[in-house]
Amino acid sequence: MYTYLIVDDEMIERKGIRMLLSRMNIRENILEASNGEEALEVFEKEKIDVLLTDINMPFMDGIELLSRVHEEYPGTETVIFSGYDEFSYAKKAISYGVSAY
């Protein structure tokens, strides 16, 4: 069984991603965090297989979160979902091994 972590400061966005996962018949262990700091706390307690994160969040943004996860939890599959379409974000995300943007 895989464990998924959805990270976004907007609850409606987290619910939307959860709904999309459900439509894809992914109903495994799905956890949530509202920012990067909370996400790292979840990583300390749980083995996360797939990280789905927004970029623009308070306290710790998604790019910094990706950097930390890449260093501290190698092998975690990562996916960014965001309204930002700037190449600089995608380039940074790719450097941290993001699976999809």
Predicted regions and their residues:
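Generic anion/oxyanion-binding catalytic loop in active/binding sites
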Residues: 6, 28, 79
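N-proximal short alpha-helices
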Residues: 6, 12, 16, 59, ...
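Acidic di-acidic motifs
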Residues: 8-9, 54
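Two-component/phosphorelay signaling modules centered on CheY-like receiver
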Residues: 11-31
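Conserved Asp/Asn-Gly motif in the active-site loop of CheY-like receiver
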Residues: 33-37
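CheY-like receiver
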Residues: 40-101
